[in-house]
């Protein structure tokens, strides 16, 4: 019984890794719909591993390390491959320049900065009730959400048909991952309204964006999340 209690959260973490790995493989093959399902599964399992570990009081150093390693694939490599695929059709042309490398490899910088962000997070003891910088799951939802909406509906076409915008999006993503900006975490210090109204604004605004914009609303929720976090810096 103790074995199950001590390792149930780790099983969810490994499930996250397994799902993320399948997502990466399918995304490379162009099966972005399968990749989308894998991201959803990984997001759910990433939530469950932490929830179960806290509920069973089974937090461990092993679990923390496994969590970061799994997240590196599901929310580091996968969004990096997303931007790799987004830039794939542009060859080595950028503006009026012919680069000595294929432009698509710049997408993998998202994976590099995700790795750096996860390492920083592991060493930072301050991020209990807020994040410093954009967390990797949110970054994945932003980048893949935009890519998926473009593939399905043509939304964000100005970004995905222009390599300058795509490179700018990658640069912004990389900076946000390691920035010192405080970001809201959906963890509650208390049940008092004054302590939680930024979170309530975020939740209600996010629901409205998805209801109004549909698919395009999913990445816009992350943009809204960044804006709300910037507004309420002093409350964190």
Located regions from the model:
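Interhelical loop and helix-boundary elements at the membrane-water interface
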Residues: 1-17, 54-72, 118-138, 182-197, ...
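Helix-coil boundary and interhelical linker segments in multi-pass alpha-helical membrane proteins
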Residues: 22-37, 77-105, 146-165, 212-215
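Topogenic membrane-insertion module of multi-pass membrane proteins
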Residues: 1-47, 221, 232
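Hydrophobic alpha-helical transmembrane segments of polytopic
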Residues: 12-15, 35-42, 106-113, 139, ...
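Helical transmembrane-bundle signal
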Residues: 16, 20-23, 78-81, 114-117, ...
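C-terminal membrane-associated helical module and adjoining short loops/tails
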Residues: 128-236
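N-terminal TM1-TM2 helical hairpin plus the immediately adjacent luminal interfacial "cap"
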Residues: 25, 31, 47, 51-54, ...
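Multi-pass membrane catalytic core of lipid/isoprenoid biosynthesis enzymes
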Residues: 9-13, 55-119
């Amino acid at each position: 019984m103790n074995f199950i209690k001590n390792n149930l959260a780790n099983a969810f973490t490994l499930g996250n890794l397994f799902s993320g790995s399948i997502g990466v493989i399918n995304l490379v093959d162009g099966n972005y719909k399968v990749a989308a399902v894998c991201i959803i599964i990984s997001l759910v399992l990433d939530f469950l591993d932490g929830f179960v570990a806290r509920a069973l009081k089974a937090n461990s150093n092993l679990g923390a390390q496994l969590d970061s390693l799994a997240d590196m694939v599901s929310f580091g490599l996968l969004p990096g491959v997303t931007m790799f695929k987004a830039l794939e059709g542009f060859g080595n042309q950028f503006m009026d320049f012919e680069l000595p490398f294929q432009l698509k490899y710049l997408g993998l910088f998202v994976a590099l900065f995700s790795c750096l962000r996860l390492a920083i997070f592991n060493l930072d003891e301050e991020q209990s009730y807020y994040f410093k910088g954009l967390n990797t799951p949110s970054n994945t939802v932003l980048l893949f959400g935009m890519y998926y909406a473009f593939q399905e509906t043509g939304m964000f076409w100005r970004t995905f048909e222009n390599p300058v915008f795509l490179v700018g999006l990658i640069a912004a993503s990389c900076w946000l991952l390691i920035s010192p900006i405080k970001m809201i975490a959906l963890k509650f210090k208390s049940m008092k309204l004054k302590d939680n109204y930024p979170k309530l604004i975020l939740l209600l605004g996010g629901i409205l964006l998805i209801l109004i914009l549909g698919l395009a609303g999913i990445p816009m929720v992350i943009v809204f999340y960044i804006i709300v976090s910037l507004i309420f810096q002093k409350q964190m």
